[in-house]
Amino acid sequence: MKFFIDTANIDDIRAANSLGILAGVTTNPSLVAKEGVSFHDRLREITKEVSGSVSAEVISEDAEGMIEEGKELAAIAPNITVKVPMTLEGLKAVKVFSELNIKTNVTLIFNANQALLAARAGATYVSPFLGRLDDIGQDGMTLISAIAEIFDRHSVSTEIIAASIRHPLHVTDAALNGAHIATIPYKVLEQLVKHPLTDQGIQKFLDDWNSQK
């Protein structure tokens, strides 16, 4: 499973990229709004830092508007992936983007039927939201597993991005259940690195070393 970072904060992106594990970035209008910068300017910054997929979301609600926006976004850099909501209009836009060889990430996926529809429309990625399903008492991992099985059984090449990740267990379970990618906030990435026994082990090594001086 690959790692994307879910942020529009350029410092977090640079920090994650320095670790050698970053395969891409996902953004959304809420994340960009927090940064207080021009959307297009920030995308230019991100695409210079990261060579992998950078998802940038359209805000239009009709297919025509999505297509117009998506073309503008795709023109910013060759590694831009246009992020499209899972709606009927979104599917129409995905079909056109697929014909134009513009990569797409269909977001706000909450059931397997939505994922399969998006894939058949030509989506490069689908993004099921784990945390938001947890919030309403549903099991996001069952959804990841179902999508992965359907895609495998029907030879679907669309990749599954586990999104709305809240904690390290989401990452582990997403990998076990067949997600191709986990897109994670930087704070969760930091948590993945940590374990108390690792810290204790490092301290013991240091103490033992220093005791010999």
UniProtKB/Swiss-Prot annotation:
UniProt-listed Enzyme Commission number(s): 2.2.1.2
HAMAP family in the cross-refs: Transaldolase_3b
NCBIfam families on file: fsa_talC_mipB (TIGR00875)
Any GO MF annotation of the entry: transaldolase activity
Pfam families: TAL_FSA
Compartment list: Cytoplasm
Protein name: Probable transaldolase
GO cellular component, one term: cytoplasm
Pathway: Carbohydrate degradation; pentose phosphate pathway; D-glyceraldehyde 3-phosphate and beta-D-fructose 6-phosphate from D-ribose 5-phosphate and D-xylulose 5-phosphate (non-oxidative stage): step 2/3
InterPro entries membership: Aldolase_TIM, TAL/FSA, Transaldolase_3B, Transaldolase_3B/F6P_aldolase, Transaldolase_AS, TSA/FSA_arc/bac
Keyword line: Cytoplasm, Pentose shunt, Schiff base, Transferase
CDD domains according to UniProt: Transaldolase_FSA (cd00956)
Organism superkingdom: Bacteria
Any one Gene Ontology BP term: pentose-phosphate shunt
Catalyzed reaction equations: D-sedoheptulose 7-phosphate + D-glyceraldehyde 3-phosphate = D-erythrose 4-phosphate + beta-D-fructose 6-phosphate
Family: Belongs to the transaldolase family. Type 3B subfamily.
Principal cellular location given in the protein's record: cytoplasm
Catalytic residue list: 83 (schiff-base intermediate with substrate)
Function recorded in the entry: Transaldolase is important for the balance of metabolites in the pentose-phosphate pathway.
Leader sequence residues: none
